[in-house]
Amino acid sequence: MKSQSKRTSRLFVFVGVVVAIIIAVLSWRYFGTGSDNNTSGAQQSARGQDTSHGGRRNTPLAPVQAATATEQEVPRYLTGLGTVIAANTVTVTSRVDGELMALHFTEGQQVKAGDLLAEIDPRPYEVQLTQAQGQLAKDQATLDNARRDLARYQKLSKTGLISQQELDTQSSLVRQSEGSVKADQGAIDSAKLQLTYSRITAPISGRVGLKQVDVGNYITSGTATPIVVITQTHPVDVVFTLPESDIPAIMQAQKNAEKTHAIVPVEAWDRTNKQMLAQGYLLSIDNQIDTTTGTIKLKARFNNEDDVLFPNQFVNARIKVDLLQNAVVVPTAAVQMGSEGNFVWTLDDANKVSKHLVTTGIQNSQQVVIDAGLNAGQRVVTDGIDRLTEGVQVEVVTPRSANTDTNPASAEKAAAEAEGSTPHQGRGRPANAPARSTTAAEKS
């Protein structure tokens, strides 16, 4: 009995311990979870109250860059593709036949008019000159003798010792000798001229090209192969074309320049349209339109003192035809294209954005003229446009701050736009902006 009582007592103790453990675990779970839930609920309630009072205060404002619309004097340019040509081009050839004895120029050097370029063997022409001079001396002596005889005949004719026929014959002989002397003088002059032609000089100032004939070759006059070609590049000309629709603007610009005794300025830019090479003026306009292309040719002249323009070089020619006064100008990046047309995002004093439809005018890669829809002094968004909706408040940042955006999504999107994977209509030129008219900003 005692043994059975001990076993029963132990069983009760064991069951009591197990029950106590179970109660402790359940109590901990119940009271601990409840406390956490209460804390979480309090936080959510606080968030709800915060949201109800101030909106999404913990959501950061979208960063954008902005610029202010300004009033400027904007010149209007017409741009056309042109080719640099020498003001004068001379093909140097020999006027006499003979062996090329020497060349007195270096290929590519600048020469002045009158500089000696080449020498032809002068000995044959020296001999011709000597012969002509000898013939002149002979005929001059004959003439002198005939004149003396004529003087005697005239005296004898007065006394009747000779007939009139003999006197006339002697007079004719004198005139014949005078003609021979003149012919001899012409032969001498011709020989001297041929001797002069044996020394070939530069007819104009300019740059010589590559030599076409080597020393020692026999040269004939009138040959198709020149000795060298000289191009005058100080000044130099640019021939370019513009559509026939631009003729009225060009003619008006010429008339305005004539009234003030000024010139119509023309600029030469490189083929990338990023660097201005030279400044010149409009020289002439062709007198007819090319019916094939519907364009007209113009010629501009440049001093080219620094030799930046080279014959046959392709350039972009820009002719200034007008000057817009008090034009409203914004950066090109601010203008967007939508279904309703061109528009910009403007900013009020609270940095809230609003869409404004605008009419664009002259524009280039940096700025665009707003003909209607915007006033000077208004702020417009130039970067971060893809994040905007009507009335949203934004944060205006500097370019440096915008580049250090800590938002991973924004940074990734900006990188994608920089790589060109995300098309951005605002980066390009507005569709209804003039394709060729540019502003002075492209000079910088």
Swiss-Prot record:
<keyword id="KW-0813">Transport</keyword>
<dbReference type="GO" id="GO:0005886">
    <property type="term" value="C:plasma membrane"/>
</dbReference>
<keyword id="KW-0997">Cell inner membrane</keyword>
<keyword id="KW-1003">Cell membrane</keyword>
<feature type="signal peptide">
    <location>
        <begin position="1"/>
        <end position="20"/>
    </location>
</feature>
<dbReference type="InterPro" id="IPR032317">
    <property type="entry name" value="CusB_D23"/>
</dbReference>
<dbReference type="GO" id="GO:0015562">
    <property type="term" value="F:efflux transmembrane transporter activity"/>
</dbReference>
<feature type="compositionally biased region" description="Polar residues">
    <location>
        <begin position="37"/>
        <end position="52"/>
    </location>
</feature>
<keyword id="KW-0732">Signal</keyword>
<dbReference type="InterPro" id="IPR022824">
    <property type="entry name" value="Multidrug-R_MdtA"/>
</dbReference>
<keyword id="KW-0472">Membrane</keyword>
<keyword id="KW-0677">Repeat</keyword>
<comment type="similarity">
    <text>Belongs to the membrane fusion protein (MFP) (TC 8.A.1) family.</text>
</comment>
<feature type="compositionally biased region" description="Low complexity">
    <location>
        <begin position="409"/>
        <end position="419"/>
    </location>
</feature>
<dbReference type="InterPro" id="IPR006143">
    <property type="entry name" value="RND_pump_MFP"/>
</dbReference>
<dbReference type="GO" id="GO:1990281">
    <property type="term" value="C:efflux pump complex"/>
</dbReference>
<feature type="region of interest" description="Disordered">
    <location>
        <begin position="37"/>
        <end position="60"/>
    </location>
</feature>
<comment type="subunit">
    <text>Part of a tripartite efflux system composed of MdtA, MdtB and MdtC.</text>
</comment>
<protein>
    <recommendedName>
        <fullName>Multidrug resistance protein MdtA</fullName>
    </recommendedName>
</protein>
<feature type="compositionally biased region" description="Polar residues">
    <location>
        <begin position="435"/>
        <end position="444"/>
    </location>
</feature>
<feature type="region of interest" description="Disordered">
    <location>
        <begin position="398"/>
        <end position="444"/>
    </location>
</feature>
<dbReference type="Pfam" id="PF16576">
    <property type="entry name" value="HlyD_D23"/>
</dbReference>
